[in-house]
A protein has these predicted regions:
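Acidic-and-aromatic substrate-binding clefts and catalytic sites of carbohydrate-active enzymes
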Residues: 36-43, 60-71, 93-103, 130-134, ...
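Acidic (Asp/Glu)-rich catalytic clusters
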Residues: 46-51, 68-87, 106-118, 148-156, ...
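Hydrophobic faces of well-ordered beta-strands that scaffold small-molecule active sites
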Residues: 29-35, 57-59, 85-90, 122-124, ...
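Short, basic, helix/turn surface patches
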Residues: 83-93, 111-120, 151, 190-197, ...
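N-terminal secretory signal peptides
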Residues: 1-2
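Histidine-acidic metal/acid-base catalytic patches
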Residues: 5-17, 27-31, 39, 43-50, ...
Length: 299
């Protein structure tokens, strides 16, 4: 009878442990947080992101003008908070031949700034998509080619260029992203997969993690409410929300990151507070708690 009780107890314990989230995530990849939610109040963002327990931060190009001649001041703020600059939003890429030289120089300048801040990666986006436009294959290839040129230059500085997929840009749909990625030279530019933009564009971000594992440099971890509650009559409406508050299967994304043994940075991003009643810190706390409770990430 005693042996049976011990067996049942051990069996129940095994079942409980088996049903728990994996506790190995922290050893595989690193979590950062983007300052974009603070709307340009970057010094506040640095303090509050650190207070949430994150060790990495993404800053934007708006920090370049005020700190380009004194990067040591911004780096001192990062160092004091115990934060590493893990990604820098370097802005748009132009493909017009008359603008290519300037666009390359812009990102080279940002790469030098990033290096001075102790970082080693920049994010490239674009504003090339016109209303109701579907870019041609040749246009998407041209974008990849220019990004290859940028990446070649920044790599000389020790800074990795990454392509960020995005709604309302060239690279909105999974098919467009695929064309771009196929023509990227991984030795020069790699992929920063935004899971919510990829989802909203019609893709499965968890599958994209597997598909692009060889070129996956980093990710934006975010969630999206789609359609917006109260706007169901417009199926294309959407807004970005805190982790766990939207429709992206984030747990599966993390499972697949574990499957491919991903060791890079997964950066939590929320473009703005989803409600005027919330603060960036409150939103960050919600997302931090999701990561702690759902994937057992240890902050």
């Amino acid at each position: 009878m005693m042996n049976r009780r011990i067996f049942l107890k051990n069996s129940s314990l095994f079942a409980l442990v088996a049903g728990m989230p994996s506790l190995t995530f922290k050893q595989k990849f690193k979590l950062g947080y983007s300052a974009i939610t603070w709307g340009g109040k970057d010094l506040v963002a640095i303090e509050e992101i650190a207070s949430l327990g994150f060790k990495g931060i993404q800053l934007r190009a708006n920090t370049y003008a005020p700190f380009k001649d004194k990067p040591e001041e911004l780096k001192a703020a990062l160092d004091k908070a115990g934060l590493q600059l893990v990604m820098f939003s370097s802005g748009n890429v132009e493909v017009d031949p008359s603008k290519v030289e300037a666009t390359i120089q812009q990102h080279v300048n940002h790469a030098k700034f990033v290096k001075a801040l102790g970082g080693n990666a920049i994010q490239l986006t674009n504003s090339l998509r016109k209303k109701d436009q579907i870019p041609t294959e040749q246009e998407l290839i041209r974008l990849a080619e220019v990004m290859n040129e940028i990446g070649a230059k920044t790599k000389e500085l020790g800074v990795q260029a990454t392509y960020h997929n995005h709604m309302s840009q060239w690279g909105e749909t999974p098919e467009e992203v695929d064309t771009i990625v196929k023509h990227m030279d991984p030795s020069k530019i790699q992929l920063e997969l935004d899971v919510a933009h990829y989802f909203q564009g019609g893709g499965d971000p968890a599958e994209a993690v597997l598909k692009y594992k060889k070129v996956l440099h980093s990710l934006h971890i975010k969630d999206v409410e789609s359609p917006i509650i109260g706007q169901e009559s417009n199926p294309k409406s959407y807004k970005f929300v805190e982790l766990g508050e939207g429709k992206v299967n984030l747990v599966q994304v993390f499972k697949n990151l574990e499957k491919i043994n991903f060791k890079g940075w997964a950066i939590v991003e929320l473009d703005g507070v989803p409600s005027p009643t919330k603060t960036p810190l409150q939103c960050g706390t919600t997302s931090r708690n999701f990561l702690r409770d759902k994937i057992s990430y240890q902050f």
